[in-house]
UniProtKB/Swiss-Prot annotation:
Record flagged with keyword Nucleotidyltransferase: yes
TM spans (from-to): none
Gene: rpoB
Lineage: Bacteria, Bacillati, Mycoplasmatota, Mycoplasmoidales, Metamycoplasmataceae
Cellular component, GO annotation: DNA-directed RNA polymerase complex
InterPro entries linked to this entry: DNA-dir_RNA_pol_bsu_ext_1_sf, DNA-dir_RNA_pol_bsu_external_1, DNA-dir_RNA_pol_su2, DNA-dir_RNAP_su2_dom, DNA-dir_RNAP_su2_hyb_sf, RNA_pol_bsu_bac, RNA_pol_bsu_CS, RNA_pol_bsu_protrusion
Subunit details: The RNAP catalytic core consists of 2 alpha, 1 beta, 1 beta' and 1 omega subunit. When a sigma factor is associated with the core the holoenzyme is formed, which can initiate transcription.
Protein known as: DNA-directed RNA polymerase subunit beta
Origin: domain of life: Bacteria
Family according to the record: Belongs to the RNA polymerase beta chain family.
Length: 1220
């Protein structure tokens, strides 16, 4: 009866049934390795590299030089990471390391050398968990996805401003000016080709080419006779080099005066100066890869013989060039079998000038290019029409700047595209995008700081006459480095407060990728194309996980297996396939650019025992599309079924059965699940839960192999026979999101452990597996309308048994200041405080740990000097003569904030006397940590893993819940209407499989895209004696009658999310008002009111609720005098005054005045009541104040005299209403 399955072990002794078909999947890597490797690169490569770019620092007169001694870098870390981090968090410090370097000072006159090691900086150091502790808070540096340096050719690009289409090429450096060559392709006339540097005005391309030494003849010789080029030559009138340089100078340096020296330096300073223009290794790699021959000469015909250095014909004229042949021709140029051509007819004045400045002999070598003449098609070959020159750059270039060969090859490629040679690039492809990781971001900050140090040092040297007195230490000031890092970690968009709700959220925030930030995109202007999922994202960036809202598609997550190569491109692993045989011995890591023309099969392909692919035909991925090919044509196979998705998306079982939008919500909401008091791993898992638990920083792994000799709630000691190693556990710590971090040991004294083994369960972890929620019995049924619109009905059992109970920790702080008026005093004797509020204080006035405190209770007793606001001259004189008199003290104690009562779990006292570093004027700081036990209640948000979210609407007694035939009451009732339209069928399959798991007392693992098939679930129904439909007879708990139809009932994994009603529920009676508008503030944090807006006003107007409206728009809003008067009258028992003018009316009057409309308000004193009347510019008949107007049924105004009313009480007339 059993369908074939394997038992796989997960976590600490949990066996799960696996029914998938994937053969050998690659083990999940340590998810934090890329972050740690990047920081390691910064320390050992990035810092020395930055020094090489800036040093040696040479004085203006050349007499003094300061250089950096390679290999002298020394990093001094704190000895015990755990204790250093704990201290940093408690005391609000930064966890940092000291970096020392050795610098050498050389006097050129006497050759005297002085070597000195200096403290370069103390900057934030990465923890083992891939985070930084900045001012006591845990932060992460997010990776950035930006356009790669290099060259990007694009055809038919739409201009933002107009509807014209353009061809263009962008030359993108890592540092320096962006350059563009472009021309319009729409319109009747042939357009000239233009050139642009940064956002400056357009320059004719001919001007730029002339400025670097080309003549009309050389331009035509190298770049052919396309109509656009001929038109550009025809229209261009400036002949000489100087005239063209002058034109460019006026545009690029429009505010500078033209000098001969300036003209000579213009082009070299923009392009050839490595300090100002740098392609970096990535840019050079991209240029060499793009500007070769292969793409352009494939599928063309040779128009001349290709001859070797020994004059041997290697490739004959008329040969059809396949891609393979094109690769061969390129290879011959690479190893110089076919000689490169020297660029002729170019005026090398600029290069001579550049050579003079930089003494860079390599510049002369860069006058060589690879030239091949081809016919684009057979027709042009047969007609022997003029061939097209295809020019490639020198393949052995390694310069970090542009050189002449590059410029010629770029212009050649641009004109080749007009002959349909080569292909345009996709700027949204990962071929043209790279990742800037934490190490590179820190290196950029370090470079900026070193540039400032260089400038300061040169200034310092120039002011000293006697250079011998200067030491390295006195010249180099490390303050810029400290300031630069401080600014970066505190204010950069890429340095973010870590999401620490649960281990999954923490892992996801460390693997986040953003397209925003400096040098990136702007969320307001980013187009749909940039945000869209791209085919190159496969295995590199998750297509599912991204935020909802305006950041959609701009903030992304790495896929499970993705890594970053030396150039910053994302690489993903594959197994190679040759002649249907899969080679599992070696993993091949490929970047997006290396996937061209290769075919990739999925990991779920059936493979026999000899690793041979069984099916003859397969659906494969090739060149951004899916094809059905023979098995022999497959080149690679995926390493795992979860290769495409991120960690969060991979944790959703039956992901393949869900709509992508709901999967997106599911992966985002899993990160918001609060850790519960008792964690429980899911019955239906995906297999990634163990990896998340193992690599999470909230769990602890053994640092050595050995025997456990001691275990308690705060530490575990492991002895390897040489030296016992103490592992400290995190005990009742507060996370960034105020959830609880508590580690519980999973080992006992005497256990033997291996290095890297989990030795404790952290928050949301159960036996070494991620456990975000609970397995509960769920029925899909309606129940008296209480689960209408995604509302959730839960059983009281979940509340009583603390199933969804979580602990939250709030921190409250108080500072004791010293001022001129006097000092704050810590005391238990607080003036005018009730005995009840002081109940939990000790003799010093600090709350006792373990106390149960409620809103308004005093946590720390503090009195502050009242201070006299404006003492008179006589009082000042008396104080000066007799000394300060004892000022009266006022109560400024720290009280429990509204809704933040709970159990005091810790008191932390920081004092200047103990050597703690506190801000100016603060002598002592006390932190109180209060733990709140929150049971689930009406208004809390809950969710499953499939994007099925809702709010608890009612908590029913167990006896009222619907129950099964055996009397088992269900825990949760969900609305079945929430499934069909959302198309997340995964939740139904999980429900059924969960029921099977419970009946068979087993657990399942169903990885994404390799899960249990529906046929298998049906067979499992038989095994578990469950009806084939998976539905059960359900009875109403109230009436005891069975429901009309069978209902789907099963076990589903439900999460309680951070959006809890306790944080959101709020009401206001009296509170603060805005200073500018005089209207109540908004929001719970400011004790604000509920905004009653324009549309709400319309609703009341439609009902004619005048008195309610009058109150809302005046007393309760911005009628300043009215509300004060009202308050006083309520206190004194007086009558409610009539409403005056709201402040917003005055704003309207000022607004109209700005539009030159004068609004007059005439006030008549009548019976001591103010009557405001607004003169209308139209002359309407004046209605006397002793008339009431009212509409009759015809809509005409009828005027009734007041005298007709017998019981007329003059005192109670609201004259404001009359005039209105």
């Amino acid at each position: 009866m059993n369908h074939i399955y394997k038992l796989k072990s997960y976590g600490i002794g949990t066996d799960r049934r696996f029914y998938g078909v994937a053969n050998k999947t690659l083990e999940t890597p340590d998810f934090l390795d890329p972050v740690r490797e990047s920081f390691d690169w910064f320390l050992h490569v990035g810092i020395p590299e930055a020094f090489d770019r800036i040093f040696p620092i040479v004085s203006a007169n050349g007499k003094l030089e300061i250089s950096f001694r390679r290999g002298s870098l020394r990093v001094e870390k704190p000895e015990n990471e755990y204790l250093a981090i704990r201290e940093a968090k408690i005391k609000g410090k930064t966890y940092s390391a000291r970096v020392y370097v050795t610098l050498v000072k050389v006097h050129s006159e006497d050759g005297e050398m002085e070597e000195q090691e200096i403290l370069l900086a103390e900057f934030p150091f990465m923890t083992q968990g891939g985070t930084f502790i900045i001012n006591g808070f845990e932060k992460v540096v997010v990776s950035q996805l930006i356009r790669s340096p290099g060259v990007c050719f694009r055809e038919n690009v739409r201009n933002q401003q107009a509807d014209d289409l353009f061809n263009k090429v962008e030359i993108i450096p890592q540092l320096g000016s962006w350059m563009e060559i472009f021309h319009k392709v729409t319109g009747n006339q042939v357009d000239t080709v233009k050139f642009r540097i940064d956002k400056h005005k357009n320059i004719p391309l001919l001007s730029f080419l002339r400025a670097i030494g080309f003549t009309n003849e050389t331009v035509r010789k190298y770049f052919g006779n396309s109509p656009e080029l001929l038109e550009s030559i025809r229209r261009h009138k400036l002949e000489s080099l100087e005239e063209n340089l002058e034109l460019i100078y006026r545009i690029v340096r429009k505010d500078d005066r033209i000098t001969e020296e300036g003209l000579k330096n213009l082009i070299p300073s923009i392009i050839f100066n490595e300090r100002r223009y740098n392609l970096a290794s990535t840019g050079r790699f991209m240029l060499n890869a793009k500007l070769n021959l292969v793409e352009r000469i494939s599928q063309t015909y040779l128009a001349e013989d290709l001859v070797s250095k020994k004059n041997k014909i290697l490739f004959k004229k008329g040969t059809y060039i396949t891609r393979q042949l094109a690769l061969e021709i390129q290879e011959k140029f690479n190893n110089e079998e076919i000689p490169l051509s020297e660029i002729e007819g170019v005026d090398s004045t600029i290069y001579a000038r550049q050579l003079e400045i930089t003494r860079n002999e390599n510049l002369w070598k860069r006058f060589y290019v690879a030239i091949v003449k081809v016919w684009p098609n057979k027709k042009s070959m047969l007609q022997e029409s003029e061939p097209v020159n295809v020019i490639a750059t020198d393949p052995n270039l390694n310069e970090k700047t542009l050189v002449l060969s590059d410029i010629i090859a770029i212009v050649s490629y641009y004109f080749n595209l007009l002959s349909n040679l080569g292909k345009s690039d996709d700027p949204d492809s990962l071929v043209n995008k790279r990742i800037v990781s934490v190490g590179e971001l820190l290196q950029n900050q370090f470079l900026i700081a070193l540039t400032k140090i260089e400038k300061n040092s040169k200034e310092k040297i120039s002011t000293k006459s006697d250079l011998s007195q200067l030491t390295v230490k006195s010249i180099i000031n490390n303050k810029p480095i400290y300031n630069q890092f401080k600014n970066f970690f505190n204010s950069s968009k890429l340095s973010q407060f870590m999401d620490q709700i649960n281990p999954l959220g923490e892992m996801a925030s460390k693997r986040k990728v953003t397209s925003l930030g400096p040098g990136g995109l702007n969320r307001d202007t980013a187009q749909f194309e940039v945000r869209d999922v791209h085919t190159t994202h496969y295995g590199r960036i998750c297509p599912v996980e991204t935020p909802e809202g305006q950041n959609i598609g701009l903030i992304l997550n790495f896929s499970v297996f993705s890594r970053i190569n030396q150039y910053g491109f994302i690489i993903t692993p594959y197994y190679q396939v040759k002649n249907r045989i899969v080679d599992y011995s070696k993993v091949h890591w490929l970047a997006a650019s290396e996937e061209f023309d290769k075919s990739f099969a999925q990991s779920g392909v059936e493979i026999d025992q000899n690793n041979r692919i069984i099916p003859d035909k397969l659906t494969v991925r090739k060149n951004q599309t899916y094809l059905v090919l023979d098995a022999e044509q497959v080149n690679y196979i995926d390493v795992s079924s979860m290769q495409m998705t991120s960690i969060s998306a991979s944790a959703i079982p039956f992901l393949e059965n869900n709509d992508a939008n709901r999967a997106l919500m599911g992966s985002n909401m899993q990160r918001q699940a609060v850790p519960l008091i008792k964690s429980e791993a899911p019955l239906v898992a995906t297999g990634i839960e163990e990896a998340v638990a193992r690599f999470s920083a909230t769990n602890l792994r053994a640092s050595i192999s050995g025997k456990v000799t001691y275990v308690d709630a705060k530490k575990i000691i492991i002895d390897d026979g040489e030296k016992p190693e103490i592992h400290y556990l995190r005990y009742f710590e507060k996370s960034n999101q105020e959830t609880l971090i508590l580690q519980k040991p999973t080992v006992k004294v005497g256990d033997k452990v291996k290095k890297g083994q989990l030795i404790c369960d952290g928050p949301s972890t159960d036996n070494g597996e991620l456990a975000l929620g609970k397995n509960v019995l769920v029925a899909f049924s309606t129940w008296y309308g209480y689960n209408y619109e995604d509302a959730i009905i839960i059983s009281e059992k979940l509340v009583k048994d603390d199933v969804f109970t979580s602990i939250h920790i709030q921190e409250q702080t108080i500072k004791f200041r010293s001022t001129k008026a006097g000092n704050d005093i810590l005391t238990a004797e607080i003036p005018n405080a009730s005995a009840k509020s002081r109940l939990h204080l000790d003799a010093n006035g600090i709350v006792i740990v373990g106390s149960e405190v409620d809103t308004g209770d005093i946590l720390v007793g503090r009195t502050s000097p009242k201070g006299e606001d404006n003492p008179t001259a006589e009082e000042k004189l008396m104080a000066a003569i007799w000394g300060k008199k004892a000022l009266a003290q006022k109560d400024t104690s720290l009280r429990v904030k509204n809704g933040e009562g709970g159990t005091v779990i810790d008191v932390q006292i920081l004092s200047r006397d103990q050597g703690d570093n506190l801000e100016e004027g603060v002598g002592m700081l006390i932190k109180i940590l209060i733990a709140q036990k929150r049971k689930i209640k009406v208004g809390d948000k809950m969710a499953g893993r499939h994007g099925n979210k809702g709010v608890v609407s009612v908590i029913l007694p167990v006896e009222d819940m619907p129950f099964l035939e055996d009397g088992t009451p269900v825990d949760i009732v969900l609305n079945p209407q929430g499934v069909p339209s959302r198309m997340n069928i995964g939740q139904v399959l999980e429900l059924h499989l969960g029921m099977v798991a419970k009946k068979l007392k087993t657990k399942f693992v169903t990885p994404v895209f390799d899960g249990i098939k529906i046929e298998t679930i049906k067979k499992l129904f038989d095994e578990a004696n469950i009806p084939e439909s998976g539905k059960f007879k359900l009875f109403d708990g109230i009436s005891g009658q069975p429901f009309e139809n069978p209902v789907s009932v099963g076990y589903m994994y439900m999460l309680k999310l951070l959006h809890m009603v306790d944080d959101k529920m709020h009401a206001r009676s009296i509170g603060p008002y805005s200073l500018t508008t005089q209207q109540p503030l908004g929001g719970k944090s400011q004790n604000g009111g509920q905004r009653f807006g324009e549309m709400e006003t319309w609703a009341l107007e439609s009902f004619g609720a005048t008195s309610v409206l009058s109150e809302l728009l005046t007393y309760k809003s911005d009628n300043i005098q009215g509300r004060n008067l009202l308050y006083n009258n309520i206190i004194s028992g007086g009558k409610i005054p009539s409403p005056g003018t709201p402040e917003s009316f005055n704003v309207l009057a000022y607004e109209l005045r700005g539009l030159l409309i004068k609004l007059e308000v005439h006030k008549n004193d009548q019976e001591n009541q103010e009557v405001e009347e607004i003169k209308d510019p139209l002359e309407l008949p004046e209605i006397p104040s002793n008339f009431i107007d009212e509409y009759n049924q015809d809509g005409r105004i009828e005027l009734n005299k007041l005298e007709e009313f017998a019981d007329f009480d003059e005192e109670n007339i609201d004259f404001d209403k009359l005039t209105r």
